[in-house]
Every structure is written in structure tokens, then in C-alpha cells.
Amino acid sequence: MAKFRLSLVQFLVSPVKSENLNRACKLIKEAAQKGAQIVALPECFNSPYGTKYFPEYAEKIPGESTERLSQVAKECGIYLIGGSIPEEDSGKLYNTCAVFGPDGTLLVKHRKIHLFDIDVPGKIRFQESETLSPGDSFSVFETPYCKVGVGICYDIRFAELAQLYSKKGCQLLVYPGAFNMTTGPAHWELLQRARALDNQVYVATASPARDEKASYVAWGHSTIVSPWGEVIAKAGSEETVISADIDLEYLAEIREQIPIRRQRRHDLYSVEEKKN
């Protein structure tokens, strides 16, 4: 199939987990009814984002949140990229994205590889590593349309991850994320366009809607970028669902017009996956 419909759900996360799950499922169903074949949720969609919240809201996988996602994916017959949730496993906490197929099967579980530890004096300091552990594996899943690579938020800053996903044959990269009011306006769109252009792939980012009263205020602006580096769909800060057609023939045309994949000097440099 040369084209498919991708939708990103940007919704206002509340402190009540059950409300978040109900709201997410409602918006997923609305997106599916409008023709979405792949739907993505935001980072930390079932809880407020913050190191003090991760232990309180953490779940096993499978657990309450992922069971709901599995059910709604099956009900709608879609591929569902389940944003991320705080996951507890063997005494450790992870920032984890679970992906489900149209039959409700768990296809892949991506644990955020690069933890969000930054300190911008006078603006923002955040240390995910205070409570979270990093993941150590790559996450690619197959669809009838194309291969899809998954990262979470801060993972997008690392060009190597996108390059490895591209080498694995991914034509769409999806990053549930929650940039803030400092890094959001400066880097959010720039990073997406860079990853799309560097690798000649579609890039999508799903953010929570902005809540000015939250302890961590998300930038919002969920976005879909083409392999030409063009923004083809973009939200504001409010709760919404955005959609775009992912056109794989267009992607192939771009790769033929500017054939950087054939022109790379593999005799001089490479980005390689390290095996454990």
C-alpha cells in the first residue's frame, strides 16, 4: 500500500489515571473512525510527567493501561503506538512505549534509551535518572505499509538512533514526547525536520496538550514531517487530533532525486549497532 493514514492524539493529561485512559481511548476511536490506520499517543499519557509521579503511577506490562490499549487497538483494527507510561519491572522503573497490532497483540515494547537529564540555568532542570533506568534495545515493528521505528522524546536528539532505524528499513519514525517551554520552541520542530531530512523518512511526534497549571508544562505542537523536511501536519498547544497521509511513493521519489543513501562513503564512516 503506497499510502496510509497516521493520526497523533494530543490530549490534556490529568492526575487521575482512569480519566486519562478513558480520554485516550475515546480520542483513539475518533481517529480510527476518520480513517487512521496507525495512531500514536503522547509520552506519559496516563500520568503527570515528573520524577515524583513515576513511582506512584508505574505499572507492570501487561497491566491496567496496556490492557486498555490492547483492547482499543483490537476494537478499532489499528496499529496503536501507546505513547509511554512509567513501567515497573524487577524493582526498576522505565519510561516505556507499548505498541499493539490490529488484533491487540503487543508487537514491541520500547524503553526510553536516552534519559532526559538536563540543566539549563535559570530555565529548567530535570533529571529522569533520579527515578528511571534507561532501556538498552531498539524497537522496530512491521506493518503492511512499512517498517516503523520507535523512540521516546529525548531519544530524538540522538541522530544515531534514527540512522540505525533507517538502516533497518524504517520509513516512519515515531517519537512520543513532551518537550517543555524552554526546549520546545527552540528545538522541537528543528529536531524532527533534521531527523526526517537526514534519513529521508517521515517523522512524527505526539505530545501532551499544554497545561499551564502542571508542574511540568508541555510544549504541545504534535507534528508530522515529510522526508523532504516539510511539516505536513502540526497541532497548537490545545487538545486535538492531527492526521496526515504517509505517502511511500513520494518517499521513494525523494530518495531517487537526492540519492544520499547510495552516495554515503561507507569506506570512510559508519554508524553500527552494538550487540550485547
From Swiss-Prot:
Enzyme Commission number: 3.5.1.3
Keyword list, A-Z: Cytoplasm, Hydrolase
InterPro entries xrefs: C-N_Hydrolase (IPR003010), C-N_Hydrolase_sf (IPR036526), Nit1/2_C-N_Hydrolase (IPR045254)
Record carries keyword Hydrolase: yes
Catalytic residue positions: E43 (proton acceptor), K112 (proton donor), C153 (nucleophile)
Presence of keyword Metal-binding: no
Pfam families: CN_hydrolase
Subcellular location: Cytoplasm
Superkingdom of this protein's organism: Eukaryota
Entry-linked CDD domains: nit
GO molecular function, one term: 2-oxoglutaramate amidase activity
PROSITE patterns: CN_HYDROLASE
GO CC annotation: cytoplasm
Reactions accelerated catalytically: 2-oxoglutaramate + H2O = 2-oxoglutarate + NH4(+); 2-oxosuccinamate + H2O = oxaloacetate + NH4(+)
Residues of the CN hydrolase domain: 4-248
Role description: Has omega-amidase activity. The role of omega-amidase is to remove potentially toxic intermediates by converting 2-oxoglutaramate and 2-oxosuccinamate to biologically useful 2-oxoglutarate and oxaloacetate, respectively.
Assembly description: Homodimer.
Family named by the database record: Belongs to the carbon-nitrogen hydrolase superfamily. NIT1/NIT2 family.
The protein's name: Omega-amidase NIT2
Taxonomic source organism: Xenopus tropicalis (Western clawed frog)
